[in-house]
């Protein structure tokens, strides 16, 4: 809570709207970054139809990604976040203190996973298959939790599941950047995020309802695993649809000829 508010204040006054206004960059850095962004925006625009703000609000690809974000990231993230303490209470005889420490392990795994996937994606300049691997990690491990008995094995599944879901988040956002630029990108990303964040309500609610109906949280994890897998298929489709249409290398070559 408090760190987020403090960083929000810093961001408000420190981060600028565009690179050319960033006083903390050198003149050379500002010029390079401005040209780089203009070149990439031109490449995206040349490979896709022009999106206005209003069109971005209702475009099928934007709405489709909103549902994918709901299924892959938000429903799973919030569904796990909300219920981990109750899950551990049901599966073990741990004290409240022990539940607090053990319940933090999935998020520690998620922290490590986000760093590793981000580093690898950046190093190899590839995001589609990194996202696919993260989706499979999450969906398979959450479904596997249905078929194990011990608390230890279930927690291993939960840790791998959380690692996969959290790793999906930054990789997912490379998809809309493939066909949205400028103000349309800001609008489209806001729409995707708004639809996806409905998972903050539906994820925990669905897990709770399934637990009440079956008496076991493992069925709730099964639901989350299936949801992540379906959303992953949607992301795979969108990546295949747009990835490769944008030729950044050609755009940079064309831009260099103008220098």
Task: Label every PLM stretch briefly.
Residues 1-8, 135, 139-142, 157-158, ...:
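A generic transmembrane-helix signature of 12-TM secondary carrier transporters
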Residues 1-53, 237-255:
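Central mid-sequence intracellular linker of multi-pass
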Residues 7, 11, 85, 117, ...:
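Small-residue (Gly/Pro/Ala) motifs that create kinks and tight helix-helix packing interfaces
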Residues 54-118, 169, 173, 203-204:
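Extracytoplasmic gate region of multi-pass secondary transporters
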Residues 113-126, 211-212:
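Helix-to-loop junctions at the C-terminal end of transmembrane segments
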Residues 125-175:
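C-terminal transmembrane helical hairpin of 12-TM major facilitator-type secondary transporters
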Residues 179-216, 224:
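A late C-terminal transmembrane helix in Major Facilitator Superfamily
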């Amino acid at each position: 809570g408090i760190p987020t508010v403090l960083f929000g204040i810093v961001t408000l006054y420190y981060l600028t709207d565009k690179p050319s206004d960033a006083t903390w960059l050198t003149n050379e850095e500002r010029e390079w970054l401005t040209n780089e962004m203009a070149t990439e925006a031109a490449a995206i625009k040349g490979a896709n139809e022009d999106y206005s703000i209003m069109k971005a609000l209702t475009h099928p690809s934007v709405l489709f990604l909103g549902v994918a974000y709901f299924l892959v990231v938000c429903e799973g993230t919030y569904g796990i976040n909300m219920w981990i303490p109750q899950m551990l209470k049901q599966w073990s005889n741990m004290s409240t203190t022990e539940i607090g420490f053990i319940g933090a392990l999935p998020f520690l795994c998620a922290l490590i996973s986000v760093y590793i996937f981000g580093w690898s994606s950046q190093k190899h300049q590839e995001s589609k298959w990194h996202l696919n691997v993260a989706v499979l990690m999450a969906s398979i491990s959450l479904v596997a939790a249905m078929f194990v008995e011990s608390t230890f094995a279930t927690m291993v599944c939960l840790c791998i599941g959380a690692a996969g879901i959290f790793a999906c988040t930054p990789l997912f956002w490379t998809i809309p950047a493939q066909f949205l630029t400028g103000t349309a990108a800001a609008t489209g990303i806001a729409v995707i995020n708004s639809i996806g964040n409905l998972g903050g309500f539906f994820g925990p609610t669905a897990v709770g309802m399934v637990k009440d109906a079956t008496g076991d949280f493992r069925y709730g994890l099964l639901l989350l695993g299936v949801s992540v897998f379906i959303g992953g298929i949607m992301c795979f489709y969108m990546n295949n649809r747009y990835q490769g249409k944008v030729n950044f290398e050609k755009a940079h070559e064309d831009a260099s000829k103008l220098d």
